[in-house]
């Protein structure tokens, strides 16, 4: 189980990404359309002044239940350990143990 502080930090980053997504997209489109160097510098400066944690690159996928950052499966939003346990308990519809 991940520390509560790490899980909360990640949630805060997700909120910031959502909050500043529209503003970031607007600045980036303006930056692409302008041809004046001075305007580009100003727009780039505004883009850099956004909070550091509002950049989507800083997000890290974590398990919804345990908060584990490694062994994360995107399709389920769970780590491999939790996925295995839930599949054995038949809590995931359509997931079956493979046999060949």
Swiss-Prot record:
InterPro entries: Ribosomal_uS14 (IPR001209), Ribosomal_uS14_bac/plastid (IPR023036), Ribosomal_uS14_CS (IPR018271). It comes from the Eukaryota. Belongs to the universal ribosomal protein uS14 family. This is Small ribosomal subunit protein uS14c. It is found in: Plastid, Chloroplast. GO terms for biological process: translation. Gene3D superfamilies: 1.10.287.1480.
